[in-house]
């Protein structure tokens, strides 16, 4: 059985992330923009973004470009890009 991660929001759509044995060979066909939850001032939201980036970095992701106050472009361990905002 392959390991994976599935989100289950209150309503569809669902998202499944699965490990595959093949290495990345081309540009991503899918780019995820992940949004942190919660309310508050722009400073509070940015603090939550940087906290999430720290957690993702600890799990193996790498921050590539930071647009302070807005979003961070990251890559997973296989080089696939995604953004955290």
Locate the predicted segments by residue.
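Hydrophobic alpha-helical positions that pack around
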Residues: 28
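Short Gly/Pro-enriched loop/turn and capping motifs at secondary-structure junctions
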Residues: 22-23, 37-39
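Short hydrophobic/aromatic beta-strand micro-patches
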Residues: 33-35
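Vicinal oxygen chelate
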Residues: 1-24, 50-85
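Short, conserved charged micro-motifs
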Residues: 40-48
């Amino acid at each position: 059985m392959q390991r994976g991660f599935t989100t289950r929001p209150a309503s569809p759509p669902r998202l499944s992330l699965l490990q595959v044995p093949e290495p990345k060979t081309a540009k991503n066909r899918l780019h995820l923009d992940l949004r942190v939850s919660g309310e508050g001032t722009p400073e509070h939201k940015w603090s939550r973004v940087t906290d999430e980036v720290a957690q993702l970095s600890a799990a193996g992701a790498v921050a590539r470009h930071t647009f302070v106050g807005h979003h961070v472009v990251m890559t997973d361990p296989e080089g696939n890009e995604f953004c955290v905002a």
